[in-house]
Every structure is written in C-alpha cells, then in structure tokens.
Amino acid sequence: MSLLVEIEKQLGNFHLDVRFQAETETLALLGASGCGKSMTLKCIAGIMTPDRGRIVLNGRVLFDSEVRIDQPPQQRRVGYLFQNYALFPTMTVEKNILCGIRSGSKAEKAAALSANLHRFRVGGLGKRYPPPLFRGQQQRG
C-alpha cells in the first residue's frame, strides 16, 4: 500500500496540519488524545473534507484541493471503523447487520447475514442486544 497525506483542516480553535508518506501494508497513527488522529482518518476516508492539501492512495488521487478533486467516500475504497459503534441498542445484532444489507432476495439477505456473522466472529451473538456485549464484540457487530 502506498499512501501520501499532506492536508490541513481548521475546526474551531483546532488546526490540523498532517504530512506523511507510507509504503507499507500496516500503518498506525499514534498520538495524544485530541491531536487529530481521528480527523486525519476521516479525511482519508472522505467523511470529512480537508481545507487544503492532497491525499493519494495507491496512485489514486482521493483529494486534491488545487485541482478540485474530492472523491466521495464510497469511491475511495477505504474502510473506517467508528470509535462509537453506532449500533441500535433496541435491535439484535442480526437486525443491526441487516440494516447494512439493502439489496437482494430474502434468501440472499439471510445468506449475507450468516456470512457476516461468521466473518466477524459473532455467530453465537446474533439474537443478543448490543448493551451487554463487550466493546470488541460491539465493534464487530
């Protein structure tokens, strides 16, 4: 994976100014609380728009303020896992997953649900509600 990030973003009194390049499969952003790690990731994923700069992933320009390129999140092929898991607490794990499966027949949705329960290793938790789940289980649900 190749990633180039050179962005700036002003949000209230906070000024984000991030510049790095990585040529590795795994990348970790480390820093103190409130230093801009999540904001940087949101900009890479397209959830938040930088004020200026460039983001290039594997040779694809995702954002470039000078030439007005700003790929929408769904075209970036970047996943973002929110810190707050945004599960509906009154719905089972199965129903939470089904919210993300919008197309297909009833049988196709059931197959996709089963595959996702297995994929995220929460197969035995499908009928449970989110509040009693551990944070890692909520994240995978």
How should each PLM-predicted stretch be described?
Residues 51-58:
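Conserved coupling/switch loops of ABC nucleotide-binding domains, chiefly the family-specific signature
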Residues 90-100:
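Short coil-to-helix segment of the ABC ATPase nucleotide-binding domain corresponding to the Q-loop/switch region
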Residues 62-79, 103-106, 110:
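ABC ATPase NBD coupling module
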